[in-house]
């Protein structure tokens, strides 16, 4: 009985290793654990460059038909957080967004990829800009593997509605977290 238990535990452990090698992942060559002035928003009292970070993802689950990217600050003093970036209808054959792809004027994403309204009221990337002295804010950047080619939404759709559609169509998601704060001047 002891040998059977050991065998089962061994199989579970090694099964976990093989699964972890195929885990859906998100990474960035631009972000460490701390956002910088490069990503910081330009406006709302912030004076950053407002460049979206490079993002790449790997090992999407079988059945993935498209991707979406979101950037969200759960620490924003709004009662509902703050959506900084909402990108969807990314083709399933893509696995990267280059640095500054969130600048809709540069056309760094393929036609058909939609960058909709953020909580700043703009389309495209709106970088971190926490209130001065509010402490460290957490920024969750997430790639969603979707079971549909398109969400059927447009660039004027607000983040909450996009989030609802993502919730209904996500097969898997992977996230990275970055932090940012602004001290009192």
Where are these regions (language model features)?
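Sec-dependent N-terminal signal peptides
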Residues: 4-14
